[in-house]
Amino acid sequence: MKITDIRIHVLKSPLAEPFAFSQGWVRWRSATLVEVLTDDGLAGWGEAFAQGLEPPEIAAAAIEHALKPLLLGADPRHIEVLWHRMYHATRDYGRKGSVVAALSAVDIALWDLTGKAANAPIHQLLGGAFRARVQPYATGFYRTRGQSEAARLADEALRHHEAGFRLMKVKLGYGVDDDIKCMAAIHRAIEGRGVTLMIDTNHAYGRAEALRLGRAL
């Protein structure tokens, strides 16, 4: 089996209601999809991570101009070899961000192809499943104004609880004082309901602010 072509599909859609997290406002939902084609008719699909701030065209360009030339004619089942080929070829300029996301998209597509070729689920190819069930968590708690949204976030926590979630990840990073107020409101709303809370500031704080927030929580 040989890779004959790699196609990139960029998806973008404006949001009716933009929202914010600590690094900025998200006004679009976007994705960079990659389709790896082979000479025996199989195709594998992968997706590059996009949080909503980076243009999906960056990962698309990395796949088209940096990664695709390294892969054409290769056996897609040689996943580890191809991963190192892509990583080492781009390590001087692509060890994080959209270039690594592009590499990840191709890697996912290669695993998808390999699973199809073997007619087996990927977890079997990776050595088996440790469990058949996982506990999901609700993420969200994004902002629509920025600060001073504690009451709305507490209501959101109650909705997640009513939907059956017992783990929740709260987006913070809007100022330590505001974060503390929001977490206090959320805690009061779900206290005694068997909910575990997690937080994610998306690298908003330095050491001093992170310690202050952690100690307060």
What does each model-identified segment do?
Residues 1, 104, 163:
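Structured loop/turn residues at beta-strand edges in well-structured enzyme cores
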Residues 1-5, 9-10, 116, 120-132:
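N-terminal amphipathic alpha-helix/helix-capping segment at the start of soluble metabolic enzymes
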Residues 66, 85, 105-108, 112-113, ...:
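Alpha-helical scaffold segments in soluble metabolic enzymes
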Residues 37-117:
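Metal- or metallocofactor-binding catalytic centers and their adjacent structured scaffolds
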Residues 127-217:
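Metal-dependent enolase-superfamily TIM-barrel catalytic cores that perform enediolate-based chemistry
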Residues 28-31, 58, 62, 77, ...:
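Conserved active-site and cofactor/substrate-binding residues in soluble primary-metabolism enzymes
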